[in-house]
Amino acid sequence: MNRKLMSRSMLVVITLSVVPWCWLPYLLTAGEEACFYCGMKRSEHGHSWMVIEYDDGSSGGFCSLHCASIDLALHTDRTLIRILVADYYRKNLIEAETAHWVIGGAKAGVMTTRAKWAFESKEDARKFINDHGGKPATIETVLKAAFEDMYGDILLIQKKRKTMHMHKLKTDHN
């Protein structure tokens, strides 16, 4: 076992006995940019990544509009400066206010049952709609939809995690 992996493993073992479980996703992705709430890595979700910046200088990176919406709801005491979102195709961060959004369609969303994707150009948004369905939307529309979808999305996430846990237990016993 190499030194880096060994020290990371030791850190996780020691930390699990001291730090609350809510920090586990963050600790397991140490050294990588990962979503504060679910631990999903930017390297795997660069097409849906979001960054929120507040007036107090704080900011956060999130795997999806779902997790970014949670952050917005929890930080109503801060003034929002801007929201950046990844262009679906290019994965570069763009202003969420000026992005061309698509809501719905056949392409599965990240952490949600109703997908919400951002595009830098109107042409790319149209191409996506032609290929996968969905409707054009604004930032206001997708944020409202994210909050409307929250309860159902949380139930879906819990169900998926339970299924993954049961599958892991099953394979560990075989």
Language-model-derived ranges and their functions:
Residues 2-12:
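N-terminal Sec-pathway targeting helices
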Residues 12-20:
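Bacterial N-terminal signal peptides
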Residues 20-61, 65-174:
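Intrinsically disordered, low-complexity linkers and terminal regions
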